[in-house]
From Swiss-Prot:
Binding site for Fe cation: 117, 121, 307
Database matches in PANTHER family: TRNA N6-ADENOSINE THREONYLCARBAMOYLTRANSFERASE, TRNA N6-ADENOSINE THREONYLCARBAMOYLTRANSFERASE, MITOCHONDRIAL
Cofactor info, note text: Binds 1 Fe(2+) ion per subunit.
Protein name: tRNA N6-adenosine threonylcarbamoyltransferase
Keyword Oxidoreductase among record annotations: no
Gene label: tsaD
Record key words, sorted: Acyltransferase, Cytoplasm, Iron, Metal-binding, Transferase, tRNA processing
Cofactor(s) the protein requires to work: Fe(2+)
GO cellular component term, pick one: cytoplasm
The enzyme's E.C. designation: 2.3.1.234
Subunit relationships: May form a heterodimer with TsaB.
């Protein structure tokens, strides 16, 4: 019996403000992973400017793909599939990656696979260790906060999601109100390490048994706290405000994740998304799940938490194995829903 041939997938990611390309072997092993960040270009605006993001993607896309091949020491003849982020994201940014992937697929006759950005974040964990099912993913990013139950590869059931602001969005808005530089999340995380949780802030548990999240009330409470202090001529230590805000967010995230993991009897909990780089959240989850027998916690390294193309290649490998193929009329879909792979085969 002959050995199964290794599968090499080229991943392309341009959903927001990182232009990325990567080559991944068998959905698990990173051969190359190249990311061109735009943070410096967006800093002075206090957030991502879609038009600027698109222009940077146009400038960088060919370069990062070429660099991914150079670092891997490979050519297009070695590639079995091209996986690209189809959505969600900024439509102009998505189109750069999708059009590049379609052009390469056509030029080199390589199968094309569209990938959901959040599926990519979840599958970043497979680049660390095998996913054991049933699994629960806590997805925390600038645009998403979700609890996703997975009974098998490519199966996604959203059991909880934010009703308003995503956790990362709340971090950025609070940081902006505090006068912290962009991106605000890492700044709050650093300050929180030095501060005390001594400012009373709300925690939105919502209705009993709910796995949904809400951070708009917390965000407003922080803004009101700062405004009231300013009106009274008082100063609030940014370290203490950061610690109080961050603990309010983490408390809800960790408590609901632990409760869902128990109720759904999962074997593994996966942390995913840009906010997964938050040291306070990582430490709180590690402390919580050290007490849960039979559940392993997987946290990707920092470089795989933020947007990258290795995670897109990893998710694309699973989609490809399930028979999913993208057509040349593929488009960027800014509002793409996270749907199980088996219902997408086309």
């Amino acid at each position: 019996m002959s050995e199964q041939k290794d599968m090499y997938v080229l991943g392309i990611e341009t959903s927001c403000d990182e232009t990325a390309a990567a080559i991944v072997k068998n959905g698990k092993e990173i051969i190359s992973n190249v990311v061109a960040s735009q943070i410096e270009s967006h800093k002075r605006f206090g957030g991502v400017v879609p038009e600027i993001a698109s222009r940077h993607h146009v400038e960088q896309i060919t370069l990062v793909i070429e660099e991914a091949f150079r670092k891997a020491g490979m050519t297009y003849s070695d590639i079995d599939a091209i996986a690209v982020t189809e959505g969600p994201g900024l439509v102009g940014a998505l189109l750069i990656g999708v059009n590049a992937a379609k052009a390469l697929s056509f030029a080199y006759n390589i199968p094309l696979v569209g990938v959901h950005h959040i599926a990519g974040h979840i599958y970043a964990n497979r680049l660390v260790e095998d996913i054991v099912f049933p699994a629960l993913a806590l997805v925390v990013s600038g645009g998403h906060t979700e609890l996703v139950y997975m009974k098998e590869h490519g199966s996604f059931e959203v059991i909880g999601e934010t009703l308003d602001d995503a956790a990362g969005e709340a971090y950025d808005k609070v940081a902006r109100t505090m006068g912290l530089p962009y991106p605000g999340g890492p700044q709050i995380d650093k300050l929180a390490e030095k501060g005390n949780d001594n400012i009373p802030l709300p925690r939105a548990w919502l209705e009993e048994g709910s796995y949904n999240f809400s951070f708009s009330g917390l965000k407003s409470a922080v803004i009101n706290t700062l405004h009231n202090a300013s009106q009274k001529g008082q100063e609030i230590a940014p370290e203490d405000l950061s610690a109080s805000f961050q603990n309010s967010v983490i408390d809800v995230l960790v408590t609901k994740t632990a409760r869902a993991a128990k109720e759904y009897d999962v074997k593994q909990v996966l942390l995913a998304g840009g906010v997964a780089a938050n040291r306070g959240l990582r430490a709180a989850l590690e402390k919580e799940f050290a007490q849960h027998e039979g559940i392993t916690l997987v946290i990707p390294p920092l470089a795989l938490c933020t947007d990258n193309a290795a995670m897109i290649a990893a998710a694309g490998t699973i989609a490809f194995e399930k028979g999913i193929r993208g057509a040349y009329d593929m488009n960027g879909q800014p509002g793409l829903e996270l749907t199980s792979y088996q219902s997408l085969t086309r």
